């Protein structure tokens, strides 16, 4: 049983404790008129969902309020993953499951039972197309969600009385219903071919003549591929009916070891794409693996960054700059509703920055989920309708450095009363404001040579070495960091962290940007894309990391055959 299944069982068990006696004695009772309209839908899942939704419109406990909004969302998730270590296949898994989320809102659009966390009941749904089985799950989940919503509404009304100022924003924005039934997506990957690639790639440390000489320094070598095909079904009492989906694939290599002083080092690399065919070819994957192994050995032999703290210019590659924006910028323009009783606009760092400058004037940022490709590469964050049934919109977030818009779902925030099509949901989770395809663009961008010349000019002007970073790891830790002398000589260093790389750095520290946009696709719970160019910061701190060095292995690794 996978982790998601276990988690869902826990959620279902916990929420079932709250449910009281079921409202209906049998699921066989139907509304004939509603059933006839739902029967026109060809998809058996949508038809069953619509039939049960029509039936649940009569949901009412004696003396209690009737729901003003009910939504059924079913995620049909097919996944595949294969992993190889040290030249042998170690894991291969295929999984198919369906997860249902039922949302019931009590009250009205102005004030309802919802909270900033998002409410709903989650249950596993049958994986076949048995309509009666699905309707039973919908029935019990709706009953539970309704009772939970009644309790939440009562508690919220009591809480609102404690605040002196009245609530200024609606809890839920009204939208026009939309009907769109898109083709079902499926996993499409040559599994045997990829298993062969993974086995070969994970064993290259011991077989390729270019890297075999330092194989004893490689403590792990892992290659993996994974794919997901998610079809999302949604119906609600406003009349929206959707079936839409996406596919995503990643092929990656991860190698690691230790330097002679015990410092742990790694190189993690790969490609992410909307289709398996867009992933790297077998030859490119092999080449990348060898390059990563060589890079790991170079890191092992590289000096530790100077113990003297540094403040000065750092040139970030497009890859690294995209990671910086993913971490520091994007979450803060996704306008999630704050807790009750607060005057904040959103929960992010830019809550009070509306109409203020948050980036240099030369930079503008747009989120355009409707763009599906860039320079021939598929964009994972693209979509046409969000997960709340609102058509996607291109949003100019930052215009010449000034914050002009937030990304908004159907839960309004101050100054933004309607959705701009950015309500997106992870499987089984409530929808929140999330980005789609972020474009960071610069006025008068510089070429790579011009950026390097600008960096060296700053080094000469300040009379000291400067830095350039190619890739970042988690927490924005530099993975490939080079010290650059004023004459242009580069030296790889290790063991560094950035100091004070934060939103203030984005606002005031970027002095130039390149004409080399890098596409960063993220195959997370909500697929997203960020496209950003190289960026030159004029004042970033670089210092030696405070790390507890690990002991080296006590004895040598197994001898390679033929060595």
Report the location of each language-model feature:
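Dual-mode signal for accessory low-complexity, basic/Gly-rich regions
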Residues: 307, 349-563
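Active-site bordering "gate/hinge" segments
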Residues: 31-385, 399-400, 499, 503, ...
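N-terminal secretory signal peptides that target proteins for export/translocation
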Residues: 1-11
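Bacterial N-terminal signal peptides
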Residues: 14-28
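Intrinsic disorder/low-complexity detector
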Residues: 4, 15, 33-34
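Intrinsic-disorder/low-complexity regions
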Residues: 1, 30-31
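Short alpha-helical segments used as structural interaction elements across diverse proteins
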Residues: 3-4, 283, 421
């Amino acid at each position: 049983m996978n982790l998601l299944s276990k988690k869902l069982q826990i959620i279902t068990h916990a929420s079932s404790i709250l449910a009281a006696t079921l409202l209906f004695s049998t699921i066989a009772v139907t509304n004939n008129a509603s059933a006839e309209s739902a029967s026109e839908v060809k998809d058996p899942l949508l038809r069953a969902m619509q039939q049960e939704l029509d039936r649940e419109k009569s949901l009412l406990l004696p003396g209690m309020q009737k729901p003003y909004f009910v939504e059924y969302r079913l995620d049909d998730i097919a996944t595949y993953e294969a992993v190889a270590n040290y030249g042998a296949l170690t894991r291969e898994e295929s999984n198919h499951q369906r997860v249902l989320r039922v949302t019931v809102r009590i009250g009205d659009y102005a004030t309802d039972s919802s909270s900033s966390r998002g409410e709903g009941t989650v249950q596993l749904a049958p994986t076949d197309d048995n309509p009666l089985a699905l309707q039973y799950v919908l029935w019990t989940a709706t009953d539970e969600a309704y009772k939970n919503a009644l309790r939440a509404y009562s508690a919220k009304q009591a809480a609102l009385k404690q605040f002196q100022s009245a609530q200024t924003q609606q809890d839920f924005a009204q939208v026009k219903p939309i009907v769109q039934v898109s083709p079902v997506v499926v996993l499409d990957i040559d599994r045997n071919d990829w298993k062969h690639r993974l086995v070969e790639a994970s064993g290259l440390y011991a077989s390729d003549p270019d890297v075999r000489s330092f194989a004893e320094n490689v403590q792990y070598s892992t290659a993996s591929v994974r794919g997901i095909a998610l079809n999302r079904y949604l119906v609600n009492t406003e009349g929206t009916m959707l079936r839409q989906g996406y596919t995503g694939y990643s092929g990656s290599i991860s190698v690691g070891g230790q330097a002679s002083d015990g410092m742990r080092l790694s190189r993690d690399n790969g490609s992410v794409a909307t289709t398996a065919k867009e992933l790297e070819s077998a030859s490119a994957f092999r080449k990348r693996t060898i390059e990563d192994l060589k890079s790991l050995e170079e890191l092992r032999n590289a000096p530790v960054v100077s113990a003297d703290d540094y403040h000065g210019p750092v040139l970030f590659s497009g890859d690294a700059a995209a990671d910086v924006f993913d971490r520091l910028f994007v979450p803060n323009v996704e306008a999630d509703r704050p807790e009750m009783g607060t005057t904040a606009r959103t929960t992010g760092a830019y809550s009070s920055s509306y109409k203020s400058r948050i980036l240099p004037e030369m930079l503008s940022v747009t989120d355009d989920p409707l763009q599906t490709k860039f320079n021939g590469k598929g964009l994972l964050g693209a979509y046409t309708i969000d997960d709340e049934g609102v058509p996607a919109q291109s949003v100019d977030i930052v215009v010449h450095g000034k914050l002009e818009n937030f990304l908004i779902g159907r839960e309004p925030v101050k100054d933004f009363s309607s959705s701009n099509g950015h309500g997106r949901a992870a499987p089984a989770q409530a929808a929140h404001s999330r980005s789609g395809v972020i474009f960071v663009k610069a006025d008068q961008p510089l070429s790579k040579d011009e950026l390097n010349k600008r960096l060296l000019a700053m080094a000469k002007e300040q009379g000291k070495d400067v830095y350039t970073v190619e890739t970042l790891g988690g927490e924005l830790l530099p993975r490939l960091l080079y010290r650059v002398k004023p004459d242009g000589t580069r030296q790889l260093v290790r063991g560094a962290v950035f100091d004070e790389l934060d939103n203030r750095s984005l606002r005031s520290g970027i002095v130039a940007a390149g004409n080399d946009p890098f596409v960063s696709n993220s195959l997370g719970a909500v697929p997203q894309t960020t496209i950003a160019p190289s960026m030159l910061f004029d004042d970033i701190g670089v210092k030696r990391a405070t790390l507890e060095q690990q002991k080296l292995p006590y004895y040598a690794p197994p001898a390679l055959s033929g060595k």
